[in-house]
Curated annotation (Swiss-Prot):
Main localization (coarse): cytoplasm
GO molecular function: molybdopterin synthase activity
Superkingdom as given in the UniProt entry: Eukaryota
GO cellular component, one term: molybdopterin synthase complex
Keyword Repressor: no
Subcellular localization(s) per the UniProt record: Cytoplasm
Protein name: Molybdopterin synthase catalytic subunit
Any single GO BP term: Mo-molybdopterin cofactor biosynthetic process
Function description: Catalytic subunit of the molybdopterin synthase complex, a complex that catalyzes the conversion of precursor Z into molybdopterin. Acts by mediating the incorporation of 2 sulfur atoms from thiocarboxylated Mocs2A into precursor Z to generate a dithiolene group.
Assembly information from the UniProt record: Heterotetramer; composed of 2 small (Mocs2A) and 2 large (Mocs2B) subunits.
Residues the entry annotates as binding substrate: 101-102, 117, 124-126
Encoding gene (name): Mocs2B
């Protein structure tokens, strides 16, 4: 059975032996890693361990699987690692294995500790006594990416660069000293601050011109007239406008097209074509249309391309402004019956009706 765990409390070695106990095992190998009290002449007080818990446990379980694939006779495997602060002489890691024979137990534990130092993401920091700063230590067995052999050695190729502080005057926009530049920046910041303050007074403070109270020391925080709206990030009140009268509502107005036709018809004849437009009738009429459509006029351009521009402009206006629908008269579909023609009925007087009835009686209409 595999026992893998990251603990924050001291590791109980007796409990480890209980986990290894098995009637079919004749050997148990236990490795205990402890904190030593010195490193390169410096007094070590304790070690601090940190780990990426989920990945560390995953790698420790993989190590157990590798051990069982190499030594199938192993019965129990224990890998305990401590996290947090570990004082001197206390156990930081315990790796143990039990098997029927001693060779498998000894070799598996040695292999497991090497793999633990190499693969498991656990970091160690040594805390020293005195004025020495604590240091993070890396395992010599850890996998590190090898440095590229083709990396360029800049130290072997010194480059001499001539430093020149002379800048052409054509590249300098502001030719003042530091004091003058600082003064200009301060003036700019103060002016912008005054503009913001004055705008805040206009937006947030009410006018007290007719009030007898003295509000010379008031501010927008204490005398604000605008309150933040609920469920809104803005202090200004926002309303949704329902435009009931406008170009988009023309279908709801029965007399809209009639009124618009009258309005547009009143503008006919107001344009006064110039002398150049009167040179030729087609050119003058086309220029009048281009002028009305706000299109650029070029007399040297082909007339067909100019007509094409006018058509494109009309299509654009029809797509964005429904007011231009009154210019278009859609022809009825051939499948639909033509609308009935309006015939004005003739009005007859009483004398005409009497004469018509008398003719019917006399039979003069049928002769």
């Amino acid at each position: 059975m595999d026992h893998v765990k990251l603990v924050n409390d001291p590791i109980d070695i007796a409990h480890i032996h209980q986990l290894l106990a098995d009637e079919g095992c004749g050997a148990s190998s236990v490795f205990v890693g402890t904190t030593r009290d010195n490193f390169q002449g410096k007094k070590v007080v304790s070690l601090a361990y940190e780990a990426y818990d989920s990945m560390a446990l995953k790698e420790m379980n993989k190590i157990c699987s590798d051990l069982r694939s190499k030594w199938p006779d192993l019965k129990h495997i224990v890998i305990y690692h401590r996290l947090g602060t570990v004082p001197v002489c206390e156990a930081s890691v315990v790796i143990a294995a039990s098997s029927p024979h001693r060779s498998e137990a000894l070799e598996s534990v040695s292999f497991a500790i090497d793999q633990l130092k190499t693969r498991v993401p656990i970091w160690k920091k040594e805390i020293y006594e005195g004025d020495y700063d604590s240091e993070w230590k890396e395992n010599k067995e850890s996998i590190r990416p090898k440095k590229s052999q083709s990396a360029f050695n800049y130290a072997a190729c010194p480059c001499k660069v001539e430093e020149s502080h002379d800048v052409p005057r054509t590249l300098v926009q502001i030719r003042v000293n530091d004091a003058e530049l600082t003064k200009r920046l301060e003036c700019f910041v103060n002016r912008k601050r005054d503009e913001i303050n004055s705008q805040n007074v206009i937006d947030f403070k009410s006018s007290f011109v007719n009030s007898d109270k003295d509000f010379s020391d008031s501010c927008a925080r204490t005398q604000s007239t605008i309150i933040k709206q609920e469920q809104s990030n803005s202090h200004l009140k926002v309303r949704r406008v329902n435009n009931r009268c406008g170009p988009q509502q023309m279908e709801m107005r029965p007399n809209y097209e009639l009124e618009l036709n009258k309005l547009m018809g009143s503008r006919d004849g107001q344009t006064d074509p110039s002398k150049e437009m009167r040179k030729s009738l087609p050119n003058s009429r086309l220029q009048a249309i281009e002028s009305y459509m706000c299109l650029t006029t070029d007399n040297e351009e082909n007339i067909f391309s100019r007509i094409k521009k006018v058509e494109n402009r009309l299509l654009q206006l029809e797509s964005i402004s429904p007011e231009y629908r009154h210019f278009t008269k859609l022809e009825p579909s051939s499948m639909e019956p033509p609308p009935p023609k309006k015939i004005r009925k003739k009005s007859y007087s009483a004398q005409e009706l009497s004469a018509f009835i008398q003719k019917i009686k006399d039979g003069s209409e049928f002769t």
